[in-house]
Amino acid sequence: MKKVYILSFAALALSWSGCTKLNEDLHGQVGNGAVGSDDVAGLLAASYGAMVGPYQSPWNWSALQEVTSDEIIVPTRGGDWDDNGAWRALHLHKWAEDHQRISDVFKDLGTITYLSGDLLRYNPTKQQAAEARFLHAFAQFSILDGWGQVPYREPGESSTSVPKVRKAADEIDYLIDELNAILPDLPEGKANTIRANKDAARVLLMKIYLNKGAFLNRLTPTFDAADMGKVISLADDIATGGYALTDHYFDNFAPTNNILSTENIFTAQNIGGSPGSNLDEEWRCTLHYNQNPSGYNGFSTLSDFYNKFETSDTRRGGSYAGQTDVSGLQIGFLVGQQYDQDSVALKDRNGNSLAFDPMVSIIESNRNHLEIAGIRIVKYPVDYVNSGSKKPENDWVYYRYADVLLMKAEAMLRNGQGAAALTIVNTIRTKRGASALTTLSLDNLLDERGRELYWESFRRQDLIRFGKYLNPWQEKPTDDPKYLLFPIPDNQLGNPNLVQNPGY
């Protein structure tokens, strides 16, 4: 088994650029001797584990989807959070080919595709193969979303070989065929949310059909009626799985969300106290140093985004049992004076009131404002049982039923079924304590997706699909269409099949 696990975890360093001595050594090690069923299970576990880095933290894929949007800003706070301008570049759409965050995510997504594809040469069971192929497709979809072209190797192809590349149209066709092929061999959905499952594959297919027009023409997307019909029928298939909107919105993300949520479709299992999860970074990246848990005082929400919520909307946040009574920390958006569990007002490091101000600039220099600038976000309730150096119990959420319903509503609206779409949206809004909409437009549907799915790594994709990504918003001017795609990192262009995206 040792030879397999050397591959599984050391391969996290793989990139798409081509041949390295490390790659040659890895490939040679796994070729020695037979691989048994336990080894294949280990390889599959490593494929799931490889998803933690790019997806299960605010620093990587989430940063590329959220900090580049109208939802999140990471202001430079005096000498804190400068990072050579990396965070400012994401929000302002001023990144270049050498942006480290973009490079790291591209590499990490490639690691998932390598591990999950390589597993197929070791005689997996039908279900193991289907799960691996789903993870492969999941990561490839992200690469397509971000970069518009997808490097790939055939299963079992040497890690020293130069990857071929599929452009958007071919990749879309490939992903649709691949997901339809593996559907029969995946486990059923609701009982297997922590694994690749049939309903997770259907959600990914929905996202492919819904974004197809945007992936083919990002500047002026079009939406084929047949593609929208596929989105609707897939949503109907998922609806037979017994999902329902969870009574308490934030229970979808709680330490016991595997029990409390009735709408989670695909999650990553986290076991409290065990290594492997980065989920605690979700609250540390945004909370102040003097809060519990102590944070890094970074990520904030823009006031224009926050103001999209009605005061009655439970998604905006408030007190949360097991969190507010333990530390004083509320859930959702944190605005104004912050308190501890005894209702004592907290201070910042300068002795000023720790009262988060909705007004925030991308560069904060006022000593009395820089620590309190910006609304903070706590989407995942804190696991105080597994705090400090331990890892939280909350399962990471990839797909939820609410997203399925909103995608169905969007497809209906784009196909001229506005009344039915409005009914779906109002079902969600009523569940969340918001007033019913009287009409549904693309603009207020985009707003509703923001309200329901904030901090879940969909905002950039949504803004591009709705034609809003290049628009100005707080602390960002109108910008160049080249930013509809990320640049191929400089260190990947040793692959002659990768061509730098236009404008870079």
Language-model features, listed with the residues they occupy:
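Membrane-proximal, proline-rich intrinsically disordered regions
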Residues: 19-68, 487-504
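Flexible, polar/acidic helix-loop-strand segments at domain edges
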Residues: 87-94, 311-400
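Conserved, well-structured interaction surfaces
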Residues: 41-55, 79-147, 162-173, 177-191, ...
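Short, surface-exposed recognition loops and adjoining beta-strand edges that mediate ligand/DNA contacts
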Residues: 33-34, 38, 58-76, 153-156, ...
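Long, intrinsically disordered, low-complexity segments
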Residues: 17-21, 40, 72-73, 79, ...
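Bacterial Sec-dependent N-terminal signal peptides
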Residues: 1-28
